[in-house]
């Protein structure tokens, strides 16, 4: 993500400067400001909301359909989202033929950039089948519902580590996950339920976040209680996607600023409607470096 950095320019009137002007006669009697000359302190505070994540949502309608519902073999969900360098993607979709299993990347998500190079193509190898640990497992597609549990029955784990005695198709046999990039920070994620898959897929909850965050789950820990249980048990992506959306939004810091004392008729930093002076404002407004203007 390219952070938008804003320079803060303000003017300050000091007692000493006014005295100098009065002593040298540069101010006429009528020009003396009313009130007692003095110093001013200006505080600039960044009051924007400090969101935990960058962007989030839910995709509820399969491609080519008119209503929300699962994607059956041969169908897919497509999601578009924005991301920049340093961002990662996490998502979850229910393995429909189960009590509480879901597909998704590892808890810390998938890195969307390697340096300046966006991740594109088939990323199915980065996806695993996970056991939410909120119900006792039964044989896939058996139709047996797990007993209603008030607490997780175990920690959330990769299904390969659960050893419940049941056999599941490999991820690559059931789904294909791809990423495309349009060159303007827009990615397209496609989650396809393959022909011959042993399970439908639920609507998808997704979130774009920073490195070091585990927004949906942490492997080896119990479910957070933020909506993943609903998704993994019933395919309802609404509670989890709503929760993630509430914590997501654009966050910008405020860059270091510069200030200058000047006459009313002077425009030392910029003139509206004219080109940049070439004296450092470009660096301040683009990367937040005020040294060019200051020097």
How would you describe each model-predicted region?
Residues 2-8:
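Bacterial N-terminal signal peptides
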Residues 3, 16, 20, 25, ...:
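Intrinsic-disorder/low-complexity peptide segments enriched for small residues
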Residues 10-34:
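Bacterial Sec-dependent N-terminal signal peptides
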Residues 29-116, 186, 195-295:
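Structured domain cores in non-transmembrane regions
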Residues 32-33, 70-83, 136-183:
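Exposed beta-sheet edge/beta-hairpin loop segments within beta-rich domains
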Residues 97-153:
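C2-type phospholipid-binding modules
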């Amino acid at each position: 993500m390219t952070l938008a950095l804003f320079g803060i320019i303000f003017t300050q009137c000091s007692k000493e400067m006014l005295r100098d002007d009065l002593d040298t006669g540069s101010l006429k009697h009528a020009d003396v400001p009313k009130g007692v000359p003095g110093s001013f302190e200006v505080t600039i505070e960044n009051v924007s909301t400090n969101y935990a994540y960058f962007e989030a949502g839910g995709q509820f309608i399969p491609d080519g359909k008119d209503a929300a519902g699962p994607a059956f073999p041969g169908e897919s969900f497509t999601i578009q989202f924005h991301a920049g360098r340093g961002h990662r993607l996490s998502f979850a979709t229910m393995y429909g033929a189960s009590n509480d299993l879901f597909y998704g990347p590892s808890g810390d998500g998938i890195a969307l950039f390697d340096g300046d190079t966006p991740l594109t193509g088939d990323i199915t190898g980065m996806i695993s089948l996970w056991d939410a640990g909120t119900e006792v497992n039964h044989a896939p597609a058996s139709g047996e519902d797990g007993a209603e549990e008030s607490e997780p029955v175990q920690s959330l784990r990769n299904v390969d580590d659960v050893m419940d005695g049941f056999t599941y198709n490999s991820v690559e046999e059931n789904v294909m996950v791809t990423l495309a990039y349009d060159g303007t920070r827009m990615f397209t994620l496609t989650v396809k339920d393959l022909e011959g898959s042993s399970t439908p897929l639920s609507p998808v909850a997704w979130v774009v976040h920073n490195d070091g965050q585990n927004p949906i789950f942490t492997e080896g820990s119990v479910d957070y209680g933020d909506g993943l249980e609903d998704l993994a048990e019933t395919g309802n992506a609404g509670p989890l996607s709503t929760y993630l959306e509430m914590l997501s939004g654009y966050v910008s810091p405020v860059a270091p600023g510069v200030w200058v004392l000047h006459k009313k008729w002077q425009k030392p930093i910029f003139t509206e409607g004219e080109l940049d002076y070439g004296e450092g404002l470009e660096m301040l407004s683009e990367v937040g470096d005020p040294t060019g203007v200051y020097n």
